[in-house]
Structures are given as C-alpha cells and as structure tokens.
Amino acid sequence: MATPREIKKRINSVKNTRKITRTMEMVSTAKSKKISDRVNASHPFSNKIKELVSSLASLGGVVHSPYLRRPEKIKTVALLIITANRGLCGGYNSNVNRMAKAKIQEWKKSGVNVRLFIVGKKGISFFKFAGEKAEKTYTHLDDKSGYREAEEFANLFLELFAKEEVDVVEIASTVYYSSASQKPEVTRVLPLEPAGEGSVSDMMVYEPSPEKVLESLLPLVVKTAFLKAILEANCSEQIARRIAMKSATDAASEMIKLLTRGYNRVRQAKITQEISEIVAGADSLN
C-alpha cells in the first residue's frame, strides 16, 4: 500500500497536469472563437462568388475556359490532405487520415494515379508510415493562416489543372458546420461544378463578355474554396483540442478526488494504528 507521502506527491502531480490541460482548453476556446468568426465572415462572399461563377459556367458553349475542362476519363487526381502539426486533439488527425487513405485506395482501384499534397506533420508521418509518397508537404500552416496560403495552393493546382497534368483536384479536410458539428470530408475543387438548368436568367447581360468575367472570377472562386478549407480545418482542430483538453481536465479532477479519498483513508488508518500502539503500550505498563 502506498504511503500518505507518495499519494500526496501523486495528487500534486495530477494537479499540475490539470493546470496545463485547463490552460490549453482556455487557449483553444479563444482560438476557435476567433477562427470561427473568420469562417462565418467569409461565407457570404464565397457563396456569392460561387453562385455567380456557377451561373456563368452553366452557359456551356458560350464560355470556354481550361478550368471547366471535363475529361472523358479521369487519369490523374491531385489530393490535398489538411491535418495538424500537433496532437492532443482527439481523433481530429486520425479521422482525416483514415478518410483520405480510403479515398486514395478507391481511386487506385479504379486505375487512377493519385498525386498527394499533405499539410501538417501528423498527416505527413501517417502516410509515410503507410508507404504513400507525397509530392509536396507543408508544415507552415497554423491558426493564423489565411488568404496568402490559400492563394499559394490555388495557384499551384490551377496551373496543374490548366496544363492537364491532373484531371481532378480534391481536398481532404475537416469541414466546419457549427461549434457542435465538424466532419472529415473530401471536397472537389476542380473542375468547377456548373449550375443546374435554368439558373441563368435570359435577361442577364454580362459586361464585358461572359468569357472575360469568368476568366477573372474562376481563380477567385478556387482561392475562396482553399481559404474555406484552411479556415474550417483550423477551427475544427481547435474545437477538437478544446474538447480533448476538457475531457483530460475532468478526468484529472476525478482522479484527484479518488486519490484524496485514498489519502484520507491511509492517513486515518495510520493514525488509528498509532493510537492503538500507544494504548497497547500504556496497557503493558499497567
């Protein structure tokens, strides 16, 4: 049985750990709130741009753009996987990695070549262990990442798609729906999905021509898609870390309660034993 001193030492150790997890929980809460505000602020603009570009794309034969190319057979896919550089965020990284791995296997079974681009140390190490070679890796993204990084990715994949080096561009990341709901999903970025029938009004007139309007807007809608993915992945990471740290803090508090009870029992037993020894000693003198 552990001595009171040993139990007390363990209680202090758990208390120190609880301080760390509680601090991390508070930091993640503040970061997730800040990033979620950025996500919500970007939605109206990105939705409007996507709506306008989809309407232009639905004009079909009127508009010609390399970014609207739809190959008869998909030969090569570019897949960008967004994970975190750090752990301590529950199943955030493992969920994205498993989903992306399943998607890669699905493409390969169909005879499609997959070009991997991985963001985050956790994704890089996972796919290195799985034997999947990444064409490019990135570890510079953090909770402050935004439009500059989105533009970097967009320019790369727009160029690959325009040169017909890839037929499809997809992003595997965690999509943010609300503070209570985030899901790992694969989102297709290119080619652009045109709007449905009747989405363009006959009364709509574009100045300058639809081709020039689309040419200027299409790179922008792709950049907003990457921006959305980056922001939502970062926000989801912070929410997952907040939940994980809260669970750790609660578990530490429960452990402290149990250890304190054990400490009191051992201490009480020791005191009782000492009293018994004193009484026994007194009796022997009599």
UniProtKB/Swiss-Prot annotation:
Q: Name one GO molecular function term.
A: proton-transporting ATP synthase activity, rotational mechanism
Output the CDD domains linked to this UniProt entry: F1-ATPase_gamma (cd12151)
Subcellular location per UniProt equals: Cell inner membrane
Residues of the signal sequence?
A: none
Q: Which InterPro entries match?
A: ATP_synth_F1_ATPase_gsu, ATP_synth_F1_gsu, ATP_synth_F1_gsu_CS
**Entry's Gene Ontology cellular component terms:** plasma membrane; proton-transporting ATP synthase complex
What keywords would UniProt list here?
ATP synthesis, Cell inner membrane, Cell membrane, CF(1), Hydrogen ion transport, Ion transport, Membrane, Transport
Q: Which domain of life is it from?
A: Bacteria
- What sections of the protein cross the membrane? none
Pfam families reported for this sequence: ATP-synt
- Topology in membrane: Peripheral membrane protein
A biological process from GO = proton motive force-driven plasma membrane ATP synthesis
Q: What is its main location?
A: membrane
Family recorded in the similarity comment:
Belongs to the ATPase gamma chain family.
Q: Could you tell me what this protein does?
A: Produces ATP from ADP in the presence of a proton gradient across the membrane. The gamma chain is believed to be important in regulating ATPase activity and the flow of protons through the CF(0) complex.
Subunit notes for this chain?
Answer: F-type ATPases have 2 components, CF(1) - the catalytic core - and CF(0) - the membrane proton channel. CF(1) has five subunits: alpha(3), beta(3), gamma(1), delta(1), epsilon(1). CF(0) has three main subunits: a, b and c.
NCBIfam families in UniProt: ATPsyn_F1gamma (TIGR01146), PRK13427.1 (NF009960)
Q: What is this protein called?
A: ATP synthase gamma chain
Gene that this sequence comes from: atpG
